[in-house]
């Protein structure tokens, strides 16, 4: 699977946008299968569905059509590997695009009437409350987003600190960190905490990694960017394969920039995140929490 993913990746990079989605999807699918096989004792993944479908006969405008995230297949197995939801769900294409941090600025400019979902954060650190022997994650909200409107929609997972010099939030949930306990026990608690909390943070790969949290507002799709990207890539690949005329119309219309950015940035981001999940390491110049 890994070798196939690499071959499709190298091929997709050289293709024009009109045909790129088809090959890029097969790269993403094989990359996902690499992770699934690793996490599930070399699962051969024989005769398995893609885990995504859509109604190609829908009369809805193209980006208002729904993608069905199935409860089985490659998509569900990928979701299970990263502790994401595996429930069957129908979501509009536009809503899925809106929930991708890697293209959130492009989406906000393209669809200016929709509320921006992502808040940039910095200075993300683990903090220790020594008297209580409890640790947690803390971060600073970007100054441009430290106003009342943005702060009002921060998820209840986080709470504001009493710091007066900057707008600092922390994760409400704590974990035990007692220096008198064995290091192995402490690390085990940290890893367990990390696995539960990490999905509340989002990153964009780059020379300087950018970090975000997602607002708690209408339109939020509580699925991992990996799952969302996989589903969208499958949908676009089917559009290219079965209805190239409609895909051509999409590229020549209002959403041209958004689709091009998705195919460029989110494709690269997907591979980066999969590699991070497989290795447990920071890959390239992007990194994952």
Which residue stretches match the model-derived regions?
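Terminal alpha-helical segments
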Residues: 1-289
């Amino acid at each position: 699977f890994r070798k196939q993913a690499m071959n499709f990746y190298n091929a997709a990079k050289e293709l024009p946008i009109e045909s790129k989605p088809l090959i890029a999807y097969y790269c993403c699918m094989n990359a996902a299968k690499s992770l699934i096989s690793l996490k599930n004792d070399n699962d051969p993944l024989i005769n398995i569905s893609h885990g995504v479908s859509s109604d190609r006969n829908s009369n809805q405008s193209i980006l208002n059509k729904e993608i069905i995230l199935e409860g089985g297949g490659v998509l569900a197995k990928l979701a299970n590997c990263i502790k994401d939801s595996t429930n069957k769900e129908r979501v509009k294409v536009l809503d899925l695009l809106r929930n991708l941090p890697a293209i959130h600025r492009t989406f906000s400019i393209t669809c200016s009437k929709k509320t921006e979902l992502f808040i940039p954060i910095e200075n993300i650190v683990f903090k220790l409350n020594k008297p209580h022997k409890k640790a947690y994650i803390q971060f600073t909200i970007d100054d441009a987003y430290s106003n009342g409107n943005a702060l009002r929609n921060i998820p209840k997972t986080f709470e504001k600190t009493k710091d007066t010099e900057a707008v600092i939030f922390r994760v409400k949930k704590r974990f035990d960190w007692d220096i008198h306990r064995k290091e192995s026990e402490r690390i085990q608690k940290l890893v367990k905490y990390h696995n539960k909390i990490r999905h509340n943070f989002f990153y964009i790969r780059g020379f300087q990694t950018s970090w975000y949290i997602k607002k708690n507002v209408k339109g939020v799709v509580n699925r991992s960017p990996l799952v969302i990207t996989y589903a969208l890539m499958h949908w676009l690949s089917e559009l290219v394969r079965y209805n190239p005329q409609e895909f051509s119309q999409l590229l020549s219309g209002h959403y041209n920039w958004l689709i091009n950015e998705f195919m460029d940035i989110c494709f690269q981001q997907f591979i980066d995140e999969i590699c991070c999940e497989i290795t447990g390491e920071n890959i390239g110049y992007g990194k994952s929490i």
